[in-house]
């Protein structure tokens, strides 16, 4: 089968309004489904906010100090804000295997591979979605979140990676419903890494991520 076109790669400067990003994702998903637009990888940064997934428990919103949005994705509460790289991945799974679990597994692997290029040994954790590593005290800590939605086999949302956010902002929620593990970042691990380096690592590991998604016959 011929190879698929490489998804459009967009990096938005500054802070992107969350509601506007949601509307843009929905519009693009409809266009991809209608074969009126190609797939897209959209890298951006949001102002401080909390998002609630479809499994969010209101008791886990401890201090709504920032705006709270219903995201429509799977999962529970998470935080987005300055210093965090957000990746919205919009792929057509009718062309890439129609396997949501394989997609989520590959998405986790993409972020893990990118972190390896940045000198961070990250991993999956059994029963806990997301990207995990050891913090400077040797504790298992979350450095990245995964939250996806699939609509008519087109993916929406994606991942967030903590580059240098204010980690105290996570204390307003129980991140992803997991209270017993801390949150960390590249900066907290002593990695003086900016968005340009993170984006370059993601770009280098993108082909391997796409290769894991088997094109449908």
UniProtKB/Swiss-Prot annotation:
Its EC number is 2.3.1.181. Gene3D superfamilies: Bira Bifunctional Protein, Domain 2. It catalyses: octanoyl-[ACP] + L-lysyl-[protein] = N(6)-octanoyl-L-lysyl-[protein] + holo-[ACP] + H(+). GO terms for biological process: protein modification process. The active site is at 176 (acyl-thioester intermediate). It is an enzyme of class 2 (transferase). Catalyzes the transfer of endogenously produced octanoic acid from octanoyl-acyl-carrier-protein onto the lipoyl domains of lipoate-dependent enzymes. Lipoyl-ACP can also act as a substrate although octanoyl-ACP is likely to be the physiological substrate. This is Octanoyltransferase. It comes from Sphingopyxis alaskensis (strain DSM 13593 / LMG 18877 / RB2256) (Sphingomonas alaskensis). The lineage of its organism: Bacteria, Pseudomonadati, Pseudomonadota, Alphaproteobacteria, Sphingomonadales.
């Amino acid at each position: 089968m011929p190879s698929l076109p490489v998804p459009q790669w967009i990096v938005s400067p500054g802070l992107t309004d969350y509601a506007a990003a949601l509307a843009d994702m929905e519009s693009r998903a409809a266009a991809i489904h209608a074969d009126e637009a190609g797939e897209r990888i959209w890298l951006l940064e949001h102002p401080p906010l909390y998002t609630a997934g479809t499994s969010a428990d209101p008791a886990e919103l401890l201090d709504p100090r920032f705006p709270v949005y219903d995201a429509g994705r799977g999962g529970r509460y998470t935080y987005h804000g300055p210093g965090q790289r957000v990746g919205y991945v919009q792929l057509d799974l009718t062309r890439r295997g129609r396997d949501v679990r394989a997609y989520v597994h590959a998405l986790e692997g993409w972020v893990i591979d990118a972190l390896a290029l940045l000198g961070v040994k990250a991993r999956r954790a059994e029963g806990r979605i997301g990207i995990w590593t050891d913090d400077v005290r040797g504790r298992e800590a979350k450095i990245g979140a995964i939250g996806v939605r699939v609509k008519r086999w087109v993916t929406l949302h994606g991942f967030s990676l903590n580059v240098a956010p204010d980690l105290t902002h996570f204390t307003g929620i129980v991140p992803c419903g997991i209270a017993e593990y801390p949150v960390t970042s590249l900066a907290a691990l002593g990695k003086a890494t900016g968005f340009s380096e993170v984006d370059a690592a993601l770009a280098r590991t993108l082909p391997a991520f796409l290769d894991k998604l088997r094109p449908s016959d």
